[in-house]
């Protein structure tokens, strides 16, 4: 596994109070071609935590319209990361 690729996999945190506070689950926007083992290694390496499980889903981009011009938002991939008990990520601080 290439170290550079691990740091490029996580694009942005998808912050929601419901996910983090109630279930200890964190949501990230990831590269569309990222696999579950790659996402797990990337989170463990960047945040120094133990990952229990990873679930992913592909989100289809919405069609948009500005007056008569029609467009489309990009498709993206979302990863739900469940941490082991006792592990926590402070997303606001970055690490």
UniProtKB/Swiss-Prot annotation:
Domain of life where this protein originates: Bacteria
GO terms for MF: rRNA binding; structural constituent of ribosome
SUPFAM superfamilies: Ribosomal proteins S24e, L23 and L15e
Cited InterPro entries: Nucleotide-bd_a/b_plait_sf, Ribosomal_uL23-like, Ribosomal_uL23/eL15/eS24_sf
UniProt-listed Gene3D superfamilies: 3.30.70.330
Keywords from the named record: Ribonucleoprotein, Ribosomal protein, RNA-binding, rRNA-binding
Keyword Ribosomal protein: yes
Entry's Gene Ontology BP terms: translation
UniProt xrefs under Pfam families: Ribosomal_L23
Subunit structure: Part of the 50S ribosomal subunit. Contacts protein L29, and trigger factor when it is bound to the ribosome.
Function: One of the early assembly proteins it binds 23S rRNA. One of the proteins that surrounds the polypeptide exit tunnel on the outside of the ribosome. Forms the main docking site for trigger factor binding to the ribosome.
Name of the protein described by the UniProt record: Large ribosomal subunit protein uL23
Native source species: Coxiella burnetii (strain Dugway 5J108-111)
């Amino acid at each position: 596994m290439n170290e550079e690729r691990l740091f490029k996999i996580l694009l942005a945190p998808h912050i929601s109070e419901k996910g983090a506070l109630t279930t200890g689950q964190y949501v990230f926007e990831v590269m569309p071609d990222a696999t579950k083992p790659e996402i797990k290694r990337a989170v463990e390496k960047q945040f120094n935590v133990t990952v229990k499980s990873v679930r992913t889903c592909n989100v289809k981009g919405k069609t948009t319209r500005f007056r008569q011009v029609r467009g489309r938002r990009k498709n993206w991939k979302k990863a739900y990361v469940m941490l082991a008990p006792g592990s926590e990520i402070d997303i606001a601080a970055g690490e």
